[in-house]
Amino acid sequence: MTFLILTILATVTPSLYSHVVQRELRVNFEPLAGQRDSWPVARAAMVTFDARSEKAREFSECRMINSMHELSRELMDSPEHTVKRASKEEMDDLVQRCSGSAEGRSWFIWPDTKWCGPGTDAKNESDLGPLEADKCCRTHDHCDYIGAGETKYGLTNKSFFTKLNCKCEAAFDQCLKESIDRAEGSAKSSMEGLHSFYFNTYSPECYEVKCSRKRDAECTNGIAIWKDSYKS
């Protein structure tokens, strides 16, 4: 009897572990031409595959994300370790494989905001969306920056993305966290997703300005250095 049980286990066990289904949200970020804020344009796809297979990149599910609302929901529902950055080339390939089209949609402003994304949907400076985080994004959009290809504080931005002063990123982080603490329900969840999208998924570099003269309150001769994040 013992031999029979062991034989059954030996037969069944490999089949139980032969397939390890993994689900990932792939996100690509690209700059918006002429932008002055630090938000990227996003494209995203949800893929499912067998992680143990030699052909792990043959997807059992391959679905393009069709709106910023959908992207925000997927980001909130996906464990952080399953959200992966994708290069432009990788995303172009996913677009072709998932939709059969050579073009994929890009998404911009976060749901229920007018300032949280590249550019703005606001009609004027006072125009805000219902999400409290929009106030944080508006302030963030008007912060000290170095545009793509520009030089400031003796530092040249050689990337295609606008980079902000690390003080701006720190203030934005704090503002979002305070807004999240005051919120409830779906608004709280949405702002948590927004915070994770910007600081964890996108994770922008920033620059720290050091004044050459300690008594120079306006730091007119400041020199900047790049930082991986405002926390580094």
Curated annotation (Swiss-Prot):
Glycans are attached at residues 124, 157. GO terms for molecular function: metal ion binding; phospholipase A2 activity. Its main location: secreted. It holds the Pfam family Phospholip_A2_2. It catalyses: a 1,2-diacyl-sn-glycero-3-phosphocholine + H2O = a 1-acyl-sn-glycero-3-phosphocholine + a fatty acid + H(+). The keyword Disulfide bond applies. Its EC number is 3.1.1.4. PROSITE patterns: PA2_HIS. Residues 19-105, 214-217 form a propeptide. Keywords: Calcium, Cleavage on pair of basic residues, Disulfide bond, Glycoprotein, Hydrolase, Lipid degradation, Lipid metabolism, Metal-binding, Secreted, Signal, Zymogen. The keyword Endoplasmic reticulum does not apply. Ca(2+) binds at residues 115, 117, 119, 141. It comes from the Eukaryota. Belongs to the phospholipase A2 family. Group III subfamily. Heterodimer composed of a small subunit and a large subunit; disulfid-linked. Scorpion venom phospholipase A2 (PLA2) that shows high hydrolytic activities towards lecithin and acts as an effective blocker of all angiogenesis key steps in vivo and in vitro. It has no effect on apoptosis and does not display hemolytic, inflammatory or neurotoxic effects. PLA2 catalyzes the calcium-dependent hydrolysis of the 2-acyl groups in 3-sn-phosphoglycerides. This is Phospholipase A2 hemilipin. It comes from Hemiscorpius lepturus. The lineage of its organism: Eukaryota, Metazoa, Ecdysozoa, Arthropoda, Chelicerata.
